[in-house]
């Protein structure tokens, strides 16, 4: 052991200087460029912990966790907790869902404060015709209606996993499904970015109170990316990472795709063993996926890429998710050993407390990283590692994305700790070599291997204030030093695990005697390489292997000093044989060929007591990917916390008084010398240096004491950094993975005198201009793991001081070394006298949001004690004036106003000029005259006695004999005039004749008119016809008349015979067919009737109204009250004269207007009085439609349709009122529609909603009462009962309504749906929809959406019953 320490002391410091420079350059470059990754918003973090009601974890695609949403799930948060107020101009939405319902549903929605408008959202429609639609909502500020920016038709997604992405870029929206673009649509939007109001909300699985279908099923991914190209890049990275046959797209049901390994920044409490917690995976960045190469490597070329990359995180303590992996690619190579030889080595992971992960036999060991944090918690940015292990065998090639393992917190991801671990015991996602592959350590030939990259955050440099850059991760690139070769043809699952050592140290205050106080540092663990020996056994090519022997245990020794060092975390590499080995922690002697190097840490003792609290960390920078979690319940007041770190950017206070000078700390004791390393082989020859100046020849000097250690020999091939440098040790080096006990300081020897200048050397040969060929490869040397005591950070660069642990015995004189870096920081001095308190600084900036709590954080770590209720705050100030509201509905027509006051009497006008007016219209016909006398055939005239009910005759048939009345007789042959007969005596009463046929009213009117005089100007006197009647043409047969009263028959005595007439035609013949009517003949003689004439019967019923007459439109009413009461009976344009006041009015559209009359013209005193007023002075009203003639005396409410179909801009209330008035319905009718001011269920008066039936215009019952329509069944009615319009047409059959659909804009309970009522019935936009009900369904409230451009049926409801007295 002493020998090794002495050899280590000869380690040249210039090698460490180069490492420091490289690490410093990488860190500075990383800090300058930053790690600004693209912004992505994971919407599943809104679910929070504990899970809300109806939300649970479920096994998702690929066996990874997902969230299951039930019907009652309601996940919503204020949008500002996750979404930036100004949204991305271009973006993409990545989705992985499994719906379990054909109804689809809303995946997410960002709404306004009232949950009426969706600003941004994604929805799956219900299944229709074997297809579904993916709908993207994109509504710009200022709109009051949700806008469907893009709609894509996709196959049915129900009951299967679906992965798709929607990208918005410029004016185009594209849909990608399974990494293939399905379709692309254009949409118009303004140049302004999409902004969200502060009170906006975001919902997952629903859209709040929008009334849209909720999503039921599983959601595994729901992420918004700020770069719309991200889905394509992820797909390309996935394809490039595939190998062999799995080189491109694979069905989701075949290969589980792990898009990203996720480590959460908060861990469960520390326990001896914690089972792995599954967390939902998210997609990795393109840079990470692009590191996996899908290109095949020629067989026989082993490849193991191990690398560590440091990051300068944009902030510390921000709760960002760590997406860091270590990749180890194991490629097929030539077998190095025979089957069963036992020299396959496993790279094991151990920690500083002795935990190890090994495998024996054919066990499958999952790759793990064991992390423990101090006091049971892990700070943000703690080291995290994972590894890929890949074989390029075409048949057994695993998907690299399936080989990612993660570790989080201080819990231990299970590792295999005994030799009989089963192959299927590794957790999901653990890397596993395929059968016929083993991992061995051996020579890798002359091939150079491609380095890979691992990303590891480091909790380091927390107290470094000089550099000004918060560094929480480290980047170091190593060339391959571990070769995994195929050594066996039988199936053996072996993994290689590599983890860099991360040593976190904290000083405890004053220095001690045993070790210098150091600031927290980080050193990457460097790997060692080993080769199989000739005998096939795996040995380390170091002196340590030779001394300790195969499988030997490390010697026991005193415990390490811990007074000034907090518990360290380190992971070392241990070579362990893959087969036939003993239990973990060491090998029995002679049990195998695998030697253990650096196995001081294989045994782990029981957990120690919790360490002291760590020092405060450096304030983190503002986060970019950290979002506020859901608001928790107020907790109880906690105990006063310890003083926090200094707030950022505070104003400097006044300088305090200078403290006393602290005492200088003592110098630490010198550590023991390390073992001497072997001299390395010469490396490549360097370029010649510039010639030196000629010096004087000096005398030989006296030999001085041994000088300081010289530099190492020429570098050979080894652990290159891929930056143009080669690094190799010169001998056996011990793994410096733990602090060592400092030994006593030995005094330095006397300094030698300066030697004389040597003689001038000969000029060397000119070197070539290019680098020479590489020299022969040297034997691989061990790579040291640098302890944290080797590194001090000052001003952002690595500096190395004299390290006793590396000092060995003096080596040969070397060439002068390179200029050294500044020395290490001195030990911390004693605390000075406290100064006077400074002035109070200004209030610090607002802290950053806390970390998101996800499903893997135990509940007991989150809950706090319930806080006391706070006092009520004072009322806030008056808010700003809101925007103007919507224009209100048109109000109902007001009642007629009271008559205005009489105006002042006007001035007397000039006398008008009297002009003869036009001739008046013909007067009405005079009353009919009494029946005339009856003349028999022989000319006897029988006087008719006067009857009291008959009026006097208006004329006589024969001049001079007013008693004669002639009647038309049957036309006979023309005869000669006979002599008038003498007056006969009154005859006896004849027998009663049979009843006559009924008389048509039209024929009766014609008969009466024929009795009137032809000159109607003389209304009361007819003109003599000179006893001659010209017979008109015979009329058409009339309808039978009513039965008249019994008439009186008067038969006089037979008169004297008259003059014989001309002989008639001889003989009798059969009557012929009546001929057509002939032309009118000349006037014939007076008719000679042989029988009495029946008197007219009583007046018949009134006939149908005739055409409008030419009567005067002036109507006389008694007074003003009479005029107002009968306003509905007077048509527009009618003149009204009031008898009591003599005023004159005209009926206009909205009421009455008074007319100014001129000067009174008196009537002469001798003028006869005016005729009496007609008994029916009003303008005849059109008859009611027969459909309105039903008996409405019982209390009912009528449901009537408008006379025409109407689109979305209706003004329906006004039309209902207007058309009801025109139809003679005097009660108030309202539209059967919901509005933005009133729900449909409240249109009818509350007192009449239950007791009155709803009927059509014929009184047929449609609904039992108003409330029965809104019971929730859609308002079912009997489709055999028609619904009539105001003009009496059946809307269910009349072609004037081509679409038998009724607008309503309500849900089944009559509540308005603000997104389904055509913007309060004010628009006919094709893109806007409203709810309507097809009457064919037998429902009046069916929930079907129709474009507001459709012209559909609008119903009107009588909102209250009005009796006849009210009418």
Swiss-Prot record:
Tissue/organ expression: Detected in testis, brain, heart, kidney, skeletal muscle and skin (at protein level). Detected in heart and skeletal muscle.
Region (Triple-helical region 3 (COL3)): 808-852
Region (Triple-helical region 2 (COL2)): 749-783
Main location, first listed in the record: secreted
Chain residue ranges for the region called Nonhelical region 7 (NC7): 1087-1096
Biased composition (Polar residues): 402-429
Region (Nonhelical region 2 (NC2)): 719-748
Gene Ontology annotations of biological process type: cell adhesion
Compositional bias (Low complexity): 737-750
Domain of life: Eukaryota
SUPFAM superfamilies associated with the record: C-type lectin-like (SSF56436), Concanavalin A-like lectins/glucanases (SSF49899)
Region (Triple-helical region 5 (COL5)) location: 969-998
Protein's UniProt keywords contain Hydrolase: no
Stretches the record annotates as Nonhelical region 1 (NC1): 229-604
Claim: Disulfide bond is one of the keywords in the record: yes
Stretch list, region Nonhelical region 3 (NC3): 784-807
Record field: compositional bias (Gly residues): 582-595
Signal sequence, renumbered to the chain: 1-31
UniProt cross-references to SMART domains, sorted A to Z: LamG, TSPN
Disordered: region residues: 267-319, 396-446, 529-784, 905-930, 974-1000, 1055-1089
Region (Triple-helical region 1 (COL1)) location: 605-718
All residue ranges annotated as the Collagen-like domain in the record: 605-665, 666-717, 808-850, 863-912
GO CC terms, sorted: basement membrane; collagen trimer; collagen-containing extracellular matrix; endoplasmic reticulum; extracellular space
Glycosylation (residues): 243, 247, 305, 323, 341, 348, 375, 402, 673, 730, 792, 795, 799
Functional summary from the UniProt entry: Structural protein that stabilizes microvessels and muscle cells, both in heart and in skeletal muscle.
UniProt name for this protein: Collagen alpha-1(XV) chain
Species assigned in the record: Mus musculus
Lineage of the species this protein comes from: Eukaryota, Metazoa, Chordata, Craniata, Vertebrata
